[in-house]
């Protein structure tokens, strides 16, 4: 599989997605202020609402001609539907994130069917002692922005 990302605003050709089938709102990890706000105010969405929203989103992507690469489900991998955090691409290099929370680290195992299609010399695993999530990375051609949060070192 050929990969290449030089910016965040060019036409999206393919994207990794993961089903929200395993989402359990009763077992929601309160790990940031946004989630805490919604949990404290009764605004945590139902599983059905999330699945419906995801279906609509996937339908829009397909109508736009985006190829969906669907990750396999991994038991115990909370937040697996947040695929942006698990890995990222800069140029032609595929980086496997190093997640701080162990249950989040499990989720990348669902990507094996996708990772196995990438040239192994293009894959870089972020070391375990550096916490870096793909959602903290923004690529803008020769400039790469890295956000820093409580879960990033």
Describe the role of every protein-language-model region.
Residues 1-153:
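The feature marks the mature, well-folded catalytic cores of soluble enzymes
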